[in-house]
């Protein structure tokens, strides 16, 4: 059912938020090298923040929250995690856009292949 899928998705998101946050804190508040690398990674990914909140066709569905309405909560969560890591996160002044319209760079294919590798290696597996 939709309710069951949504319930599982909420649990999965909570897990991933917690897990990623713990790594940001661990690395940002770790050695000088780990903090530098975390800062570099955050800066490199900051150009994509705006795309998280761009409107798409799915936003026309009344049951879904508008992406733009989620931004303040996202920013508060990110700010809290980065502050705990002794860092700050600033979205890029020159954001990427167009992903929801199908405009993607070459890197997307590589990322999708990596994310799908376990599923392809073990079809039908569940956890």
For the regions a language model picked out, list residue spans one by one.
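A contiguous pocket-lining binding segment that forms or flanks enzyme active sites
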Residues: 3-62
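Extended, helix-rich structural scaffolds rather than catalytic motifs
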Residues: 36-127
């Amino acid at each position: 059912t939709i309710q069951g899928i949504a319930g599982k998705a909420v649990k999965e998101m909570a897990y991933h938020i917690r897990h990623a946050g713990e790594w940001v804190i661990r690395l940002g508040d770790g050695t000088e090298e780990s903090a530098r690398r975390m800062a570099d990674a955050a800066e490199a990914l900051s150009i994509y923040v705006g795309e998280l909140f761009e409107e798409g066709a799915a936003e026309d569905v009344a049951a879904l929250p508008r992406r733009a309405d989620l931004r303040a909560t996202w920013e508060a969560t990110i700010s809290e995690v980065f502050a705990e890591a002794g860092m700050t996160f600033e979205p890029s002044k020159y954001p990427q856009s167009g992903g929801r319209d199908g405009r993607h760079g070459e890197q997307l294919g590589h990322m999708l292949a990596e994310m799908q590798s376990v599923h392809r290696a073990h079809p039908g597996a569940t956890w």
